[in-house]
Amino acid sequence: MPSSFVSQLSPSLFSILREQLEKKGFTISIPPHTVFQGRSPTVSCTVYQSGKIVVQGKGTQEFVEFFLEPEILQTFSSQNVQQDLRSRIGVDESGKGDFFGPLCTAGVYASSPQAIEALYKTSICDSKLIPDAKILSLAQNIRSLCACKVITLFPEKYNALYANFQNLNSLLAWTHATIIDNLAPHPAGAVFAISDQFASSERVLLQAVRKKCSDIELIQRHRAEQDVVVAAASILAREAFLSSIHALESQYQIRLLKGASGKVKQRAKEILHNKGQVVLEKVCKTHFKTFNEVLGSGNQ
């Protein structure tokens, strides 16, 4: 599919689509001649007063195939996806861009064509396109089909490890390599691993994997979440992130926000004021510039 999509939307669906986009974290605005426009880091969805809907951006295919068509338009013209049934390990993470909460890395080992076919039938896709309410049930399905491994680094542990690695990509490479080594058969044989290329050089992850699992083939690509097994891993990572956020909220009796927006910064200031720096450090990633900005404002 090209990086744009045009269709017609019934006025009765305008509010439904807007509500779903808001739940997914899209930023909503109302440019001239539109009903509304929703934007995420990878896709924009514009609904015009005429009913025309235009989707643009590098995330267009996933957005249309896994959300817009099946859930809003109730059509399925894009779902004839060629299925890759090769046994493989998919790895993905959640939380690296969130000021509050842990870094969660998950791996899924789909060891048979039957398991992979079942993942396709479950409509697995990138977790960023799935409402949080659906994540839990999808994660349960994935665990029933495949071998899985999740590493959750709560802020206290994450901050200590980051101080050691001094680089987020190096820390990510370590968690990814640990997951792959844990799930991979030894010898790996025909099984390979696939991951998003999160560093500018493929060597960062490759070297980490080679230290632990010398014989497995590693494939790195941008937008690896388009692979169904990597997408399954992204769902498990997201599930771990959401459950960990809830655990931190319960432990410290605070409300945490996702992302790293101005609202997140304001919430951090409130936590610093009400709970103190010790608690703030236990619920956030202290290498974010937001942390020092919040501390600075607290000392004024």
Curated annotation (Swiss-Prot):
GO terms for cellular component: cytoplasm; ribonuclease H2 complex. InterPro entries: RNase_HII/HIII, RNase_HII/HIII_dom, RNase_HIII, RNase_HIII_N, RNaseH-like_sf, RNaseH_sf, TBP_dom_sf. It is found in: Cytoplasm. Its cofactor is Mn(2+); Mg(2+). It catalyses: Endonucleolytic cleavage to 5'-phosphomonoester. GO terms for biological process: DNA replication, removal of RNA primer; mismatch repair. Manganese or magnesium. Binds 1 divalent metal ion per monomer in the absence of substrate. May bind a second metal ion after substrate binding. Pfam families: DUF3378, RNase_HII. Its EC number is 3.1.26.4. Signal peptide: none annotated. Residues 86-300 form the RNase H type-2 domain. The keyword Transmembrane helix does not apply. Keywords: Cytoplasm, Endonuclease, Hydrolase, Magnesium, Metal-binding, Nuclease. It comes from the Bacteria. One of its GO terms (molecular function) is magnesium ion binding. A divalent metal cation binds at D92, E93, D196. Belongs to the RNase HII family. RnhC subfamily. Endonuclease that specifically degrades the RNA of RNA-DNA hybrids. This is Ribonuclease HIII. The lineage of its organism: Bacteria, Pseudomonadati, Chlamydiota, Chlamydiia, Chlamydiales.
